[in-house]
Every structure is written in structure tokens, then in C-alpha cells.
Amino acid sequence: MALVSLKLQWADGADTSVPLPAYETSGAAGADIRANCPDGPVTLAPGARALVPTGLRMAIPQGYEVQIRPRSGLALRHGITLVNSPGTIDSDYRGAVGVIMQNLGDAAFEITHGMRIAQMVVAPVVQASFELSDSLSETDRGSGGFGSTGGD
């Protein structure tokens, strides 16, 4: 497994005692990232969303991105997910990282200081060149979409 060096820095006002992102198992693809809200918890009412600070800034190597993804346990047990999943942090962004969380559950949910709120996955980036064409190659699927490949 290749290791990519990701430089981290505390954002202004962050509590530097909050643990840094960490892989919880040797086979984990995503490192858990935590809420850094030293001024108090963030309460999400049902249907509400909020930008939750992580207290981190990062320098992602060129040719990579960081994807921010929901934690499955929060989604299953509480209906907590991320609005723009996966969220992308580009290699040229240097600002504070926040996680846009949403409560799809039936009860209010409290995001506490230091809570594991999301996973971050470091992934390679491939950029494409875009060009208009007079024709596209034919496929068996053609223009079928939105459920066209299955019976249900």
C-alpha cells in the first residue's frame, strides 16, 4: 500500500488537542476526521444541515484529492450524512476544512467537540481534455439511463 504525505496545519481558533485524522484499522481506506468545535456542540434538527469545522488546513500533493465521505455508523444509527458526498478537497485549496453534514433522521442530533464525523480518502486525480465531436461510438446501452439496465 502506497503512502502519500499529507501536510496538516491547525486552522485559526482550532483546539489543537483534538486528534488528527487516523485510520482505525490496517485495511481502512478512509481516515476518520473529527469535529473541532471548541465553542460548543452543533445540534442538527431533523432535515437541517450545517458546516462543521474540523480545525484543519491541509496541503494535498498535486495529482491527488481528498474525498470527504459519510461514516456508515452515523448514517445507519442516526440518519446523519453529508450533503455533497463525496466532498472533494482539491490539491490547490489551503483554507480551513469543513464538513457539510445533514440530519435525515427523525430526532435532533448533537455533534460534539472531537466526535468522529466523516472519513477522508486520499485518491489520485485524472484530468481529461474535452473536445466536441460530430459522432460518438455506439454501445448496446445507447442512451438508456435512470434504471434502464435492470428490471426493478
Curated annotation (Swiss-Prot):
Pfam families, sorted: dUTPase
Keyword Phosphoprotein tagged: no
Class of enzymatic activity (EC top level): hydrolase
Binding annotation for substrate: 71-73, 84, 88-90
GO terms (BP aspect): dUMP biosynthetic process; dUTP catabolic process
Biological or metabolic pathway of the protein: Pyrimidine metabolism; dUMP biosynthesis; dUMP from dCTP (dUTP route): step 2/2
EC number per UniProt: 3.6.1.23
Molecular function, one GO term: dUTP diphosphatase activity
CDD domains per record: trimeric_dUTPase (cd07557)
Keyword Hydrolase listed: yes
The protein's required cofactors: Mg(2+)
Reaction catalysed by this enzyme: dUTP + H2O = dUMP + diphosphate + H(+)
NCBIfam families according to UniProt: dut, PRK00601.1
UniProt-recorded name of the protein: Deoxyuridine 5'-triphosphate nucleotidohydrolase
Origin species: Roseobacter denitrificans (strain ATCC 33942 / OCh 114)
Gene label: dut
